[in-house]
């Protein structure tokens, strides 16, 4: 298991933008991680105060960070950055609210040089909350 210290070593993100709490499973090309969503998240102050819902773009960011942990934990990529290059086929199926535990899966399906394509999904209680195809560029 990759704990929060290893996540922080791999990713440059910090509060309030660090959206991965723990890695549950990891293999060469796939990772499963979680984010505990609490009412204390700063984005709930404005989205929406009377009906707090995690913004979909932040769910996708959490998925991107999940993929980033896997890629940046590899010896050859330590100290590098991963940048979003695109998103495709993004779908939001279920609202994510305070108290939810977001289980995020990212599977690398294609690599070409410094570009990688990832199939990603986020689930709450075994139900699909969001999914999409993410494209990344690995930079210096």
UniProtKB/Swiss-Prot annotation:
Compartments (UniProt record): Cytoplasm
UniProt GO cellular component terms: cytoplasm; membrane
Entry keyword set: Cytoplasm, Lipid A biosynthesis, Lipid biosynthesis, Lipid metabolism, Lyase
Gene3D superfamilies found in the cross-reference section: Hotdog Thioesterase
Reactions accelerated catalytically: a (3R)-hydroxyacyl-[ACP] = a (2E)-enoyl-[ACP] + H2O
Any single GO BP term: fatty acid biosynthetic process
UniProt record similarity statement: Belongs to the thioester dehydratase family. FabZ subfamily.
Class of this enzyme: lyase
Coiled-coil annotated spans: none
Gene Ontology terms for molecular function: (3R)-hydroxyacyl-[acyl-carrier-protein] dehydratase activity
The gene coding this protein: fabZ
Active-site annotation: 47
InterPro entries cross-referenced by the UniProt entry: FabA_FabZ, FabZ, HotDog_dom_sf
Principal subcellular localization: cytoplasm
EC number: 4.2.1.59
Alphabetical list of HAMAP family matching this protein: FabZ
Name of this protein: 3-hydroxyacyl-[acyl-carrier-protein] dehydratase FabZ
Highest taxon of source: Bacteria
Role of this protein: Involved in unsaturated fatty acids biosynthesis. Catalyzes the dehydration of short chain beta-hydroxyacyl-ACPs and long chain saturated and unsaturated beta-hydroxyacyl-ACPs.
